[in-house]
Amino acid sequence: MPGQTQGAKRWRVPGRGWRWAGILLLVWLGLASPAAGRIDPYVSHYLRTTEPIELPWDAEGHMLTFTPEQLTDGKNRFQSACLNCHVGGSTLPAPNISLSLKDLRGATPPRDTIQALVEYQRDPRSYDGTEVSYGCRPVPPSWMDDEALRNLAAFILRAAQVAPGWGSNAIGGG
């Protein structure tokens, strides 16, 4: 009929709407997936940590909670800053002093709490506490802030508690 326009035909590609729905679902699942995907396998398996755990904060018995993600961050920091001298919790420059829980407790002052490990990392002292330790470099806040250093300390302490062979100086199965 004259004067009337017919609506333009719209072409639809079959399944196009479903494709977009599928893509959006995948994106949503990626963003909403549990944090377990960000947990290092070493942390979940050897540190036996898939849920938040409590570690000793200070010698008075106060505890601090750490998530598996924080322990993963601590592990990554350990690998980038400490691994050259502390493979598997051993201490290559001083093999008789490891990062085992026994050796951490035996230091003066003891280094078996998060607070003590952070203090040590800021100002390394000899095992008996009498002099500056030149074997371990100080970690200034400009390098690692307090939260990062607590995560590193938490990784070391948790590994000393439960990781098989940690601090045993049995590198390479020897």
Swiss-Prot record:
Note describing how the cofactor binds:
Binds 1 heme c group covalently per subunit.
Where does the secretion signal sit in this chain? Answer: 1-37
Q: Which residues form a coiled coil?
A: none
> Could you give one GO CC term from the UniProt record?
plasma membrane-derived thylakoid membrane
One GO MF term on file is:
electron transfer activity
Instruction: Work out whether the entry's keyword set contains Secreted.
Output: no
UniProt-listed InterPro entries: Cyt_c-like_dom, Cyt_c-like_dom_sf, Cytochrom_C550
Say which family it is in: Belongs to the cytochrome c family. PsbV subfamily.
Outline what the protein does. Possible low-potential cytochrome c.
**Name of the protein described by the UniProt record:** Cytochrome c-550-like protein
Q: Which gene encodes it?
A: psbV2
